Amino acid sequence: MLPELLLARVLHPRAVICSFAIPGDPGDTCDTLSDRWGITIDIFKSLNPGVNCPNLVANMEYCVAGTVSPDTPSTTTTAKPTMTPTSTPTKTTTTSTATTTRAMTTTISSDAPSPTQPGLAKDCDKFHLVVSGDNCYSIQTKYGISTDQFKAWNPYINAECSNLWADYYVCVHVPGATISTSMPMPTPSGPQPQMPGIVSNCRKFHLIQAGDNCYTINQAVGITLAQFRSWNKNVNADCSNIWLGYYVCIGV
């Protein structure tokens, strides 16, 4: 009897098939990386067996989505279903684009279309399918909703709106919400493509190059940050959401 009991405790090592990995940044910990990707510490550890939490090694790749075979008795071959994160990282650079594509699945209810971005309002009753080229400004304008409403109904979308997923649904209405009459977006004048939110009377444009930031642009053309942001209304306060290869306004 004892040999059989001992045999029942023999476990296979965990096997991980990683489908998406990212390099750690300087100062990253298991907690910060897990939080950025919306996964639990336990899932992160299971996807990265042998990881030495809490500290991570900068520039070493860590798995954040994949399939994990659990520790199982030697007599079974059952595996866990695929684990997928529920969020995208909030870190952005000037090379970010308006939409990204992730091979992940998340839904909020059986009545909602699928797939949806994570964290949508549970009482959402109207959805928008994100397509390439969409951004928060264009979606909000189309449905006549405010930035505060959009962020409240889609809390996992970050402040820079750089983590919209193409081909996923976002929430654009909840019961009782007050919205303004949506208006067709005017066709922008000037060179293309442009950052969203450029004023209609813009006369001078600048193409964002690698290494550009608001300070270097403003210094080069002799304008203030207040002027720059008044002409480029979708650029946030810390200027972390300008897009490489897009035009911004530098004069009216």
UniProtKB/Swiss-Prot annotation:
Region of interest (Disordered), ranges: 71-98
Low complexity bias locations: 72-98
Keyword Repeat: yes
Subcellular location, principal: secreted
Gene3D superfamilies: LysM domain
Keyword Repeat in annotation: yes
One Gene Ontology molecular-function label: chitin binding
GO CC annotations, alphabetized: extracellular region
Role, per record: Secreted effector that binds two substrates, chitin and N-linked oligosaccharides associated with human skin glycoproteins. Could provide the pathogen with three important functions including shielding host cell wall chitin from the human immune system, shielding the pathogen's glycoproteins from host degradation and immune surveillance, and helping facilitate pathogen adhesion to human skin.
Protein name: Secreted LysM effector LysM1
Lineage: Eukaryota, Fungi, Dikarya, Ascomycota, Pezizomycotina
Record's comment describing the protein's domains: The LysM (lysin motif) domains are small globular domains involved in binding chitin in eukaryotes. LysM1 contains 3 LysM domains. LysM domains 2 and 3 bind both chitin and human skin glycoproteins.
Residue intervals of the LysM domain: 20-64, 126-172, 204-250
Stated induction or repression of this protein's expression: Expression is induced during growth on keratin powder but not on human nail fragments.
Family: Belongs to the secreted LysM effector family.
Subcellular location as annotated: Secreted; Secreted, Cell wall
Gene of this entry: LysM1
InterPro entries from the UniProt entry: LysM1-like, LysM_dom, LysM_dom_sf
Alphabetical UniProt keywords: Cell wall, Chitin-binding, Repeat, Secreted, Signal, Virulence
